[in-house]
Regions:
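A structural "hinge/loop" feature
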Residues: 34-55, 77, 104, 170-183, ...
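Append "and occasionally in soluble cytosolic enzymes with long acidic Gly/Pro-rich linkers
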Residues: 225, 303-386, 390-391
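Ligand/substrate-recognition segments at binding pockets and active sites
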Residues: 218, 360-423
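Extracytoplasmic/peripheral linker and loop segments enriched in polar/acidic and small residues
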Residues: 309, 321, 343, 396-405, ...
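Gly/Pro-rich hinge or "lid" segments in bacterial periplasmic/extracellular proteins
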Residues: 176-235, 239, 352-353
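Ligand-site clamp/hinge motif
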Residues: 227-272, 394
Length: 460
């Protein structure tokens, strides 16, 4: 089994909010690093839907449950749940101690009002597709006029969700829990659905999660404080300072004591592992794939399936793995993580001559494509640029932050962009979450669907 050297810190345990309890000892200020910025503080208005944004939402806002990596569930906003109506509905018994940061109790009505707002076709949310599993919605998650919406407040603290097909509460939570946050709808009264996303409230958000908003320097730093009244107990710190810092500065920042924890991208090279050990940091090796890299393609600016396939064949994924994971990666031939139960057994092989033939077939005219990447992937982008040039494809690189990258893909500004995600229980999560009517990053036109090839490599 291939192995990846990964750097882990004991400080990470202090931020495992699932383990927070009233007996947690305050740790004053915890300094937390991210390699990319969040793109919104409103959880249903994120162009990227990335973990860099979700990690922020999970602290400010609350979800129904915790879903652990092994698929087990623990209460969060809901203290318990059960099936109803022969398996077509689920009852969530909300924690009666839960409250928004302004002191207002969180009720089932807040949940139903949140869902009603976001399924309203007039509301310009980017997260509507998550509600398409509920009865009374169409395939995009928009409420169908004249039909009862599958979100009901049975009583003050009981939320009932009704599904289009029989679904256990556990299956629903495994699939959609990360998409459902309760909003302070009592602060939205009198606001038209089409105006909700523009409210100043989202600049200084009020949630019901374990941390309260203090201040933000957009794209650079976010300061939160512990919520002493959180129903599961206050986090074990007083203040949390989240700073965007380049991945190349990870080790030096940790060693210098400028950071206590670094989320996402905490892997170190084999060479840097010795530096980390020498500084007294514990270095562990893992065998589970922890990064999945994608080259997202704009199907509107690259309309030919032959040209898109040529891009896939022109890339040397072995070289990309060597660059990104010091050879501890594995090329992928599809959206599915190799070696998992969902893997179809497809194999990959580079074929530059085949790519050239497909370019001719697709009528590629030598135009220059724009490839967007974040700073920590600039080396990977340069290698892709070189490999594509060997097949005759001209690419220029634009280095931007994560929020700009995903917004640019959504707006059609870029022809291609490098992204990555952490593989999980849902094998098509990355593609599905960015391929919806409201957030079609691949720009696949209705009625002209063809699978958007994304050059993939997994890192273990």
């Amino acid at each position: 089994m291939k192995r990846l050297t990964a750097l882990l810190l004991a400080a990470a345990l202090a931020l495992s909010l699932a383990a927070c309890g009233p007996e947690g000892k305050a740790a004053d200020t915890v300094r937390y690093g991210l390699s990319n910025a969040w793109d919104a503080l409103m959880p249903y208005n994120s162009p990227s839907g990335s973990n860099y944004s979700r990690i922020i939402y999970d602290k400010i806002y609350d979800r129904l449950a915790y879903v652990h990596a092994d698929g087990t569930l623990e209460p969060r906003a809901a203290s318990s749940w059960e099936s109803a109506d022969g398996g077509t509905a689920a009852l969530f018994h909300l924690d009666e101690k839960a409250a928004f940061h302004d002191g207002t109790p969180v009720t089932a009505e807040h949940w139903t009002d949140t869902i009603a707002l976001l399924t309203d076709p007039a509301c310009p949310t980017l997260g509507r597709s998550a509600f398409a599993v509920l009865s009374g919605t169409d395939d995009t998650g928009a409420a169908v006029p004249g039909e009862a919406l599958g979100a009901e407040a049975v009583d003050k603290y009981t939320l009932k969700l009704t599904f289009k097909t029989p679904t256990t509460p556990e299956d629903f939570l495994l699939d959609k829990n990360r998409e459902y946050y309760v909003l302070p709808t009592h602060l939205l009264e009198g606001t038209a659905p089409e105006d909700v996303m523009e409210l100043a409230l989202w600049d200084e958000p009020v949630g019901s999660g374990p941390c309260k908003f203090v201040s933000e320097t957009p794209g650079s730093q976010l300061v939160l404080e512990a919520n002493p009244d959180y129903q599961l107990g206050a986090p074990g710190f007083d203040r949390l300072v989240i700073t965007v810092i380049d991945k190349s500065n990870l080790l030096t920042s940790l060693i210098a004591g400028d950071l206590d924890y670094y989320a996402f991208g905490g892997n170190v090279s084999v060479e840097d592992a010795e530096v980390a050990r020498a500084a007294g940091l514990e270095v562990l090796e893992g065998t589970v794939p922890n990064s999945f890299y994608e080259l997202m393609l704009n199907n509107e600016t690259i309309p030919s399936a032959a040209v898109r396939r040529a891009i896939d064949l022109a890339l040397d994924k072995e070289a990309l793995c060597l660059h990104t994971a010091q050879g501890l990666g594995e090329p992928a031939a599809s959206d599915l993580t190799p070696g998992t139960g969902y893997d179809s057994g497809l194999t990959w092989a580079r074929n530059v001559d085949g790519a050239k033939a497909l370019l001719a077939e697709g009528g590629y005219d030598g135009r220059t494509y724009t490839l967007a990447c974040t700073a920590n992937r600039s080396g990977l982008a340069a290698l892709m640029q070189q490999e594509l040039a060997e097949a005759g494809i001209t690419v220029t690189i634009e280095t931007v932050d994560s929020a700009t990258l995903f917004a640019g893909m959504a707006d059609g500004k870029y022809d291609m962009a490098i992204a990555s995600h952490t593989p999980g229980a849902l094998p098509l999560w990355f593609t599905e979450s960015r391929f919806t009517a409201d957030n079609n990053l691949f720009h696949v036109k209705k009625g002209r669907y063809s699978r958007s090839p994304m050059a993939k490599a997994t890192k273990r």
